[in-house]
């Protein structure tokens, strides 16, 4: 599924939607409002302790933003999604959706991660 402005039509404007990427090197996150506008983003190297970093980051977010819905991708996505009651999303699908939503004119995505690299032609 590729996201568009209408993808957010089911959310109230004051909703909080969190995208998490649990990678082999870092925990990356972006918090969007119900219109898809970024409210917060963070990149944190986890030094082999992704759960510890994720817990600290989520606790900080919960102090300032209530009612967060989450989707998780990356190396640890399935396990973290189960723990949080969130949905796990394949990382290529997440990258295509994000690039298409934020940069509709984009024709490709290059992802250089800690574990692998990918070229995606849109």
Task: Please give the residue ranges for each predicted region.
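Short glycine-aspartate micro-motif
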Residues: 17-21, 69-71, 107-110
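A short acidic Gly-Thr/Ser loop motif
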Residues: 21-25, 75, 112-116
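Short glycine-rich, Thr/Ser-proximal phosphate-binding strand/loop in the N-terminal lobe
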Residues: 14-52, 56-59
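A short, basic/flexible loop-to-alpha-helix module at the beginning of a structural domain
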Residues: 2-12
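Short beta-strand-loop/turn "lid" adjacent to the catalytic site in phosphate-handling enzymes
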Residues: 34-35, 43-46, 61-93, 119-121
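Glycine-rich phosphate-binding loop of actin/hexokinase-like ATP-binding domains
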Residues: 42-43, 90-122
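Alpha-helical scaffold segments in soluble metabolic enzymes
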Residues: 53-56, 60, 79, 98-101
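Short helix-loop-beta connector
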Residues: 11-14, 65-66, 103-106
């Amino acid at each position: 599924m590729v996201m568009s402005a209408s993808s957010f039509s089911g959310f109230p404007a004051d909703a909080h939607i969190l995208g998490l990427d649990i990678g082999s090197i870092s925990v990356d996150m972006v918090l969007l409002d119900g219109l898809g506008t970024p409210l917060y983003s963070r990149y944190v190297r986890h030094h082999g302790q992704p759960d510890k970093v994720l817990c600290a980051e989520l606790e900080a977010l919960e102090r300032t933003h209530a009612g967060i819905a989450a989707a998780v991708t990356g190396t640890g996505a399935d396990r973290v999604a189960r723990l949080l009651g969130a949905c796990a999303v394949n990382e290529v699908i997440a990258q295509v959706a994000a690039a298409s939503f934020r940069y509709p004119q984009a024709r490709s995505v290059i992802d250089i991660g800690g574990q692998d690299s990918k070229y995606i032609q849109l």
